[in-house]
Amino acid sequence: MNKYQTHLLEHSVVKILSGTGKKHIALVAGGMSAEREVSLISSVGVSKALIELGYKVTFIDMGADIAVKLQEINPDIVFNCLHGTYGEDGCLPGLLNIMRIPYTHSGVLSSALAFDKIHSRSCFLKNNINMADSIVVSKSDHINTDPMKRPYVIKPLKQGSSIGVEVIFEEDDFHFIDYDFPYGEDIIIEQYIQGQELQVALLNGKALGVLEIKLLKNRFYDYETKYNKGFAKHVCPAQLPANLYKKLLIESEKIYKTINCKGPVRAEFILEEQTNKLYVLEINTHPGMTPLSIVPEIAAYAGISFTNLIEEIIKMASFES
């Protein structure tokens, strides 16, 4: 961790002035979710880009007093750099709508839909967007056998960054009765699909490109693989037939429009090996901005520097009436 990251962690509010007279940006990050660390790492690059662009930047570590802090500093715009609960689930956008402060990223309903795997799935299926078979299992069900034929995926309903995601393969010594539901009373059990991991970056409704994830160490694209060098190889642009590449772009833009997203979004797909069928895994309305994050990498391929990416995100800041 560098000195700048340590500085952000040690101070709940850090004021960084660029001195050029541009708008005042409140950079809200950290927070109380399991994705706090990822959010803080993202905020380092974002804050540097904002300062480079000439903005006055105030860093706020999200807490229960967020409304008071925002009233005190009175920013022109909030850059929502949170991941997970309270920032990515629509809570912070709801507060900012009430306070009439323009903010980056998606609004209340879009954020809430994307964050909740049950409701996003229902919405996508109603709009003919293909997803893997799944069921919801509750702790109170007291299931003592595999709830689905192996291999299957265990997903918390409301977590990002693959936190809490497990893949149960045929050979695994795993007994479902021992699963302790660490991230809530309900989980999604989803059919595991073997195939190409494909990621699409979108900005303001336009798909920028497709990237393929090639796993080098772990069996699936988990938290460790996402945030550590040497665990995966990124191939950008993804090596796909032109018609399939175009289909991914079109499908991603359809998903973006379906839940009325705003700003940057990352859509995750799997291309099944045997059937060449495309499945949507999820949509992320708060994609990471870390050095290993996918949206900045695809944006760079599309000719958009990290600083320009942040500027475009700021340009779309608004609140909902």
Curated annotation (Swiss-Prot):
GO biological process terms held by the UniProt record: cell wall organization; peptidoglycan biosynthetic process; regulation of cell shape
EC number: 6.3.2.4
UniProt GO cellular component terms: cytoplasm
Location of this chain's protein in the cell: Cytoplasm
Ranges annotated as spanning the membrane: none
Residue positions binding Mg(2+) 2: 282, 284
Domain ATP-grasp per the UniProt entry, residue ranges: 121-315
The organism's place on the tree of life at top rank: Bacteria
Matching InterPro entries: ATP-grasp, ATP_grasp_subdomain_1, D-Ala_lig_Van_CS, D_ala_D_ala, Dala_Dala_lig_C, Dala_Dala_lig_N, PreATP-grasp_dom_sf
SUPFAM superfamilies: Glutathione synthetase ATP-binding domain-like (SSF56059), PreATP-grasp domain (SSF52440)
Any Pfam family hit: Dala_Dala_lig_C
Binding site for ATP: 148-199
GO molecular function, one term: D-alanine-D-alanine ligase activity
Binding site for Mg(2+) 1: 268, 282
Gene3D superfamilies: 3.40.50.20, ATP-grasp fold, A domain, ATP-grasp fold, B domain
HAMAP family named in the record: Dala_Dala_lig (MF_00047)
PANTHER family with a match to the protein in the record: D-ALANINE--D-ALANINE LIGASE (PTHR23132), D-ALANINE--D-ALANINE LIGASE B (PTHR23132:SF23)
Annotated function: Cell wall formation.
Name the record gives this protein: D-alanine--D-alanine ligase
